[in-house]
Amino acid sequence: MAAKTYDAGVKDYRSIYWEPQYQVKDSDILAVFKVVPQPGVSREEAAAAVAAESSTATWTTVWTDLLTDLDYYKGRAYAIEDVPGSDEAFYAFIAYPMDLFEEGSVVNVFTSLVGNVFGFKAVRALRLEDVRFPLWFVMTCPGAPHGMKVERDLLDKYGRPLLGCTIKPKLGLSAKNYGRAVYECLRGGLDFTKDDENVNSQPFLRWRDRFLFCQEAIEKAEAETGERKGHYMNVTAGTMEEIYERAEFAKEIGTPIIMSDYLTVGWSAHTSLSRWCRKNGMLLHVHRAMHAVMDRNPNHGINFRVLAKILRLMGGDHLHSGTVVGKLEGDREATIGWINLLRDRFIKADRSRGIFFDQDWGPQPGLFPVASGGIHVWHMPALVSIFGNDSVLQFGGGTLGHPWGNAAGACANRFALEACVQARNDGRNLEKEGKEILTKAAQTSPELRMAMETWKEVRFEFDTVDKLDVQHR
């Protein structure tokens, strides 16, 4: 029932939005925030303030509260937990009723969950750690245009991770030289090559020219190797009209896969492109450029596991998800948690991997996690062990930096991959026996032997900034 009286003044959030007795419903959208309150603000008041400001409340009581049933529509802070190792932060668990959100609109959900509340003065820092999307909401979102199984059937590639390479230097090449690099990598044994995230349509490399030279390279490499090949043609652009124009041209010339920078292009634009890909039989590779702006600070922002769930709802067939062993940020257990969220149909809550809620994806197909960023042949055993078959392992400098050229770099990576897959299938421990496995394989591959010699001293040993708030056993 709506309130029967109207009392003006600043709200006491705790009295309205803190409900520790609340029984969570299957239809609720659940969120867990890491909260650092301002000095003098109690945990219960801060948690209730987050629930209020991310749902129905404003800073004061208003007379129009009498015109609706606020008790039905409000978000509820229903639990508080300590954050391991922190004296200041705590976890606030909040439940939101289903009618607060537009069906199928990730944009609408997150306009509430990470909107004005993140600038709210009652908290010093706020981070969205996880979200449970109920099945009713999942079923209204497009999901992956095709998914892992359909992609494997289209490419006729089974039983191993897929291999890719980002063309370098990422900016500055002419279209003809860019296409030449694509051809050499694909001919050497890779499944895919890729535009980097900021390759759009610069004066030195207009998109139409790049698409044509890359497609020529794909067709030539396919004819020579007898394998299906592809290049992630980045259709990211400044307007939706330009995105569709580039996607349509890619379809017209016969390319199998295009690419989107889903965070910088915008969630509505990306969702529209994902729907287009499903209708037009086009695979969609997704880059996460800008993610670290939101997810790297351990106390403020949005955890990448939430960004990964958002992408799974909006749609993509591949998503960059860190490497654990390369140059980019990524705690091992957290990364494995992200991989599970992208690929599996149902994920159980697992705090050791940072997963707070069970998540049921229903019939939505899984997508390939992509390991990319500072990886080379010495990382291959660990990558195959961590990511398994259903993944894309993407070596940029680890292909193009080979002393003998791009084709040799691609050949070295393919040889290393197949050696690791065979060893794994034979029951060997890749992470313990990786050096021995690669050394033996290099006896019959001079390209691999040279790659191992080139990168034997290259390591990225910086500590991870965003670590899980749990002690691994």
UniProtKB/Swiss-Prot annotation:
Site (Transition state stabilizer) location in chain: 327
N6-carboxylysine found at: 194
Pfam families: RuBisCO_large (PF00016), RuBisCO_large_N (PF02788)
Enzyme Commission number: 4.1.1.39
GO biological process, one term: reductive pentose-phosphate cycle
Disulfide cross-links: none
Keyword Transmembrane helix assigned: no
CC cofactor: Mg(2+)
EC class (word): lyase
Sequence positions that bind substrate: 116, 166, 170, 288, 320, 372
Active-site residues, Swiss-Prot/TrEMBL: 168, 287
InterPro entries the record matches: RuBisCO (IPR033966), RuBisCo_large_chain_AS (IPR020878), RuBisCO_lsu_C (IPR000685), RuBisCO_lsu_C_sf (IPR036376), RuBisCO_lsu_fd_N (IPR017443), RuBisCO_lsu_N_sf (IPR036422), RuBisCO_lsuI (IPR020888)
Cofactor binding mode and count: Binds 1 Mg(2+) ion per subunit.
Molecular function terms from GO: magnesium ion binding; monooxygenase activity; ribulose-bisphosphate carboxylase activity
Binding of Mg(2+), residues: 194, 196-197
Record's keyword annotation contains Cell cycle: no
Keywords, comma-separated and alphabetical: Calvin cycle, Carbon dioxide fixation, Lyase, Magnesium, Metal-binding, Monooxygenase, Oxidoreductase, Photosynthesis, Plasmid
Quaternary structure annotation from Swiss-Prot or TrEMBL: Heterohexadecamer of 8 large chains and 8 small chains.
Family under the similarity heading: Belongs to the RuBisCO large chain family. Type I subfamily.
Function of the protein: RuBisCO catalyzes two reactions: the carboxylation of D-ribulose 1,5-bisphosphate, the primary event in carbon dioxide fixation, as well as the oxidative fragmentation of the pentose substrate. Both reactions occur simultaneously and in competition at the same active site.
HAMAP family reported in the protein's UniProt record: RuBisCO_L_type1
Identification of the protein by name: Ribulose bisphosphate carboxylase large chain 2
Organism: Cereibacter sphaeroides (strain ATCC 17025 / ATH 2.4.3) (Rhodobacter sphaeroides)
Name of the encoding gene: cbbL2
